[in-house]
Amino acid sequence: MASSGAGVTAAGSANEAPEIPDNVGDWLRGVYRFATDRNDFRRNLILNLGLFAAGVWLARNLSDIDLMAPQPGV
């Protein structure tokens, strides 16, 4: 009886492990479909807002660099 209980728990834990790759696979499949759907307004909006935010971040963080200043050690 104890051996059958151990078998069930081992099988249960063995069955739980593949669920994570399935969920990750479903998530990756959804991301791929979302990224490759050319007629999706939400994708275009999110992508454009993300690119805009990245551009604003770069402009704000790289504007402090003075490219004409003499470089140390040169």
UniProtKB/Swiss-Prot annotation:
Residues 1-24 are annotated as: Disordered. It holds the Pfam family TOM6p. Residues 1-14 have a biased composition (Low complexity). Keywords: Acetylation, Membrane, Mitochondrion, Mitochondrion outer membrane, Protein transport, Transport. It is found in: Mitochondrion outer membrane. Belongs to the Tom6 family. Forms part of the preprotein translocase complex of the outer mitochondrial membrane (TOM complex) which consists of at least 7 different proteins (TOMM5, TOMM6, TOMM7, TOMM20, TOMM22, TOMM40 and TOMM70). This is Mitochondrial import receptor subunit TOM6 homolog. The gene is TOMM6.
